[in-house]
Structure formats: C-alpha cells, structure tokens
Amino acid sequence: MDKIVLTGGGTGGHVYPNLALIPSLQQEGFEVVYVGGEGDTIERRLTSPLGIEYHSLPVVKLVRGLSLKAVKNNLSIPIVLTRSIINAKKLLKQIEPSLIFAKGGYVSLPLILAHGKTPLVCHESDLSFGLANKIGKLMGGRMLTSNPATKGECVGIPLRQELFSKNKVTARRGLNIPQNDRVLLVMGGSSGATALNNAVVKHLSTLTKSFTVVHLYGNKNYTPPKRTDKYIPLPYADDMASLYAVSDVVLSRAGATAVAELSALCKKALFVPLPKGVSRGDQLDNALLAKSMGGRVLYEDNLDNLPEEIDKTLHSPPMKSTYGDTNGKIVAVIRDSISRGEKCKNKKQSQNGLP
C-alpha cells in the first residue's frame, strides 16, 4: 500500500484542504500519514479524531515587522529549521512514503526542504505563491493551484464534504437558535482577528437588533462579551457545517479556503481582508476573487460602516458556486506523480545495471 505524507498547519487554511483529501485518498487505497508542528497545534487537534498516524517537527513561523518580538522570533528560524530538516530526513527514511503532499505554510517547509528523491506535490490556495511553496517549486515540486491565473496546474481547493451535509432547520434546533431569527456568522479565522473582533463588539448592540450573532473569535488572547440569547461567542468550532447551515450572512476574513467554502455553499458573505502590513497581501487578492463571485468586500479602515455593509450583504444575491471535483483531480495527480517517480527510479537502476 502506497503511503502519502500530508503536511501543512498553523492555520485552518493549511489544514482543512488536507483533511478534505483524506477520505478520497483512503478510498483509493492510500495509507495517509500526517506531519505537523509540535505541541497543541490545530493540525494535531483536527487529525486526532481521524485515527491516522501523526508525526511532529519543530517549526517557527516568520513574523513580519521589526518589533523586538519579531526580531527575536526570526533570529531563531535558522537554528530551528536546521534541526527540523534533520528530523524530517530521519522521519522520511522511517516512513518511506511514496509521495509528499504539502499544503504550504511554514509547517510544511521542513519536509519540502528534506524531500530528496520522494515525489513532492505542493498545493497553493491563494492567487500568489507563499514562501514555502515558492521554495517547493525551486526544489522540483509539482505545483497545483486553485486559480487559472496562478502558474501551475489548476485543480481548485479541496473542500470537506461534511460542509454540505447539514440543513438549516436541523442545525438551528441543535444550536437552540429560533427558526425565524436572522443569523450573522462572524469568522476571524482559526487564529482570530483582533480588528474584526473589536469591530463586531463595538457594533454589537446594533447588530443584535437585526441578528443573532454567532461569533467565532479565535483562541488568541481575546475575551469576548458574555453570551446572551442574541450573542453566541465561540473560540472555535469543529462543526462548521452546522454554523454555515444556520447562517443568513457570513462576515469573514478573506482566507482562500473561507472564500472557496462560502462560494461553494452559495452564502451571502462580506469579506474583510487582512491588510498588507500584516500579511503578504494574499487576502487582498482573495477578496477581489470573492467579489467576482458575488461576495462583498469591506476593508479594515472602513469598519465603522460594518452594520450598514452587513445589511447590504443581507439584501444582496448569494455568492456563485464554482465548486468541482477537486479531490478527484488531486488524487489523479498524486497517482501520476508516484508513477513518474517509479519510472525515473527504474530507469536509473537500469542505467546502473541494477535489477
């Protein structure tokens, strides 16, 4: 049985597409192994219930900016990364996978750098390549993309099938939300979003006049107001299918996976992209893509207009779905890449006179 190593983590956008692929890979007879970061990471927590083999490597995220904290963090990267690459090489020798599928982000970088002769497939959800995938391309990885405008093989973004499994009535019963209420779902991303969280709280009295607000505020150092009948704060939700099902409007950061999920579900959505100062600008690109699919966009410097923009979104058409058989396309690429790797290996053995 061929083993596939999936790697990626740190945020939901680098984990959920991998989770979406796992059932398809298992149905095709592959054994799946996940490699993520050390400690209580989102990738460890989300893969744990699946019962798949999990291995961890030491990783450090690049922090943008020139603050003392950022400088101290970034100075540790060469030391931690070197140790991680050494560990990754040992791990690959132990696992002997047929292929590595890297979802980008700093968690995937050690395996990208250590992959050696193991076939490498990298997937980029954003319109522009992140640093890890840029390195993956230089290291000979096969590049898959979510958009035809991005250089590579366009396959789309893998989406979890369970997202399509819930209906509004049943989901509202399960969450004790009245059937006639309008529901606003706020998603700041798995790491939270301080500016978005603060804007929601600032306008909460206005928003709760029109909506029951379900607020996914993230886990990082944020204390939301107390729960009421019209305000439901949650640090995180494993059952996103139910939350999507109950919502009439979604307020979200413009992560590529969030854009893909909300368009596939034909939701009414307002996106607040991360500004370029705290990111490489990928969410600004994603927001423009979302707008072309019927989503609305509000930039951080206009968050004072949040209630009005949410109301406009409520009375706008839903997003248009462009969802296709992404999983099938990726599984086909994986099979082809394994086959190419085996042919290359056999050719070299033949040239060297080996059986």
Regions found by a protein language model. Name each.
Residues 86-101, 108-121, 134-138:
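Glycosyltransferases and closely related glycan-assembly transferases
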Residues 6-19, 194:
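A short, glycine/small-residue-rich beta-strand->loop->alpha-helix junction that serves as a flexible
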Residues 308-312, 323-355:
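C-terminal alpha-helical cap of glycosyltransferases
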Residues 52, 118-119, 248-249, 266-274, ...:
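Structural loop-to-beta junction motif characteristic of Rossmann-like glycosyltransferase folds
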Residues 3-11, 26-80, 300-303:
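Conserved nucleotide-sugar phosphate-binding/catalytic loop shared by glycosyltransferases and other
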Residues 3, 31, 39, 53, ...:
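Active-site-proximal region of nucleotide-activated glycan assembly enzymes
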